Amino acid sequence: MKNITILGATGSIGTQTLDVIRKEKEELKLVAISANKSYKKVIEIIKEFKPKYAVLMEENAFKIVEDFCVNSKIDTKVLKGMEGMIYISTLEEINTVVTSVVGMIGLVPTIKAIESGKDIALANKETLVVAGELVISKAKEHNVNILPVDSEHGAIFQCLRGNKKEEVKNIIVTASGGPFRGRKKEELIDIKPEHALKHPKWNMGRKISIDSATLMNKGLEVIEAHFLFGVDYENIKVVVHPQSIVHSMVEYKDGSVIAQMATPDMKLPIQYALNYPNRKESQIEPLDFYKISNLTFEKPDMDTFLPLKLAYEAGKKGGVMPAILNGANEVAVDLFLKGKIEFLQIGDLLQECMNKFYKSMEATLENVISVDKEVREYLGKKYDI
């Protein structure tokens, strides 16, 4: 039996993780959850799974859930804020922490969980993007597995198993291309949030959907792959694959390319991470090769989708530059969703902040938190948010 904590239990990945646990109750036990403010969903989770702990970040939501548990005579202990997230990430009984919160908020709990010897099922891209070197070194120090939950890194992880790192030539990360695949910059001038939120293949949260539309999501995955698999940026390629059947590939120096293929369903990488190193019965629809008409691959347009290009630049620059990129992107996406900036301005703001805030300094926890704060305060004042 593996005991599980889910950080971000009410979001897209968290909800699908619950689906996996629901079907594997003999092997997986939900011990603790966290959420921001979705108290109705948290109450439903508590009713069904009866976790020992639930953490809410927002004060009002915390009080509502706490009152519910007291009045319903449910034993779930309700905690609040970052202290609560760290507490449920470091519980002695926990084997695996699923980090599916979005943004920088997942960084500190993830590091604390690693220091406590917990395996990490990582769905929070930002953690590795802003502090990849620190996270990977701590994982090695504490003999902890970092198990990628997203489909691309989960695919690469599987393609690498049983092979030697020195035999790898290239990692090939596939991208659906998002809702605006094939469009040129002039065709993206009047894009509204409702257009960008309509992903052709995946059902995701709002922030990740916008990142997919700008190809920033793929840029973050490139940086993540660099740290996860120890591969130079020159050897990490992005290929647009609109069918989303091939989830990523590894090219070896002898010319062999190993690909991981599956129906596009996040429950597969979640299930693989939670059960690693074992495989369990499938919870997804199997591939029917007779129904797949074709598989196509295209080169990404980095001039139109500037964030992908900037992610490569930030990764190669290293230090705190990925943290600057990430902080600027989180704010820019929020500004776009609120109608304060245009779609193409997202890339412009990333470029502006990378130029303005870069300092030659090591990506320590203190430094990345500091530069992230600077970027957010600057954009907050600029746009009065």
UniProtKB/Swiss-Prot annotation:
Residues binding Mn(2+), per UniProt: D150, E152, E221
Protein name: 1-deoxy-D-xylulose 5-phosphate reductoisomerase
Keyword set includes GTP-binding: no
First-level EC class: oxidoreductase
Pathway annotation from the record: Isoprenoid biosynthesis; isopentenyl diphosphate biosynthesis via DXP pathway; isopentenyl diphosphate from 1-deoxy-D-xylulose 5-phosphate: step 1/6
GO BP terms: isopentenyl diphosphate biosynthetic process, methylerythritol 4-phosphate pathway involved in terpenoid biosynthetic process
Family, as annotated: Belongs to the DXR family.
One MF term in the entry's GO annotations: manganese ion binding
Catalytically driven reaction(s): 2-C-methyl-D-erythritol 4-phosphate + NADP(+) = 1-deoxy-D-xylulose 5-phosphate + NADPH + H(+)
Enzyme Commission number(s) of this protein: 1.1.1.267
Known role: Catalyzes the NADPH-dependent rearrangement and reduction of 1-deoxy-D-xylulose-5-phosphate (DXP) to 2-C-methyl-D-erythritol 4-phosphate (MEP).
Taxonomy, superkingdom: Bacteria
Binding site for NADPH: T10, G11, S12, I13, K37, N124, E126, G205
SUPFAM superfamilies: 1-deoxy-D-xylulose-5-phosphate reductoisomerase, C-terminal domain, Glyceraldehyde-3-phosphate dehydrogenase-like, C-terminal domain, NAD(P)-binding Rossmann-fold domains
Listed cofactors: Mg(2+); Mn(2+)
Residues noted as binding 1-deoxy-D-xylulose 5-phosphate in the record, renumbered to the chain: K125, S151, E152, S176, H199, S212, N217, K218, E221
NADP found in the keyword field: yes
Transmembrane spans: none
Keyword tags: Isoprene biosynthesis, Manganese, Metal-binding, NADP, Oxidoreductase
Classification via InterPro entries: DXP_reductoisomerase (IPR003821), DXP_reductoisomerase_C (IPR013644), DXP_reductoisomerase_N (IPR013512), DXPR_C (IPR026877), DXPR_C_sf (IPR036169), NAD(P)-bd_dom_sf (IPR036291)
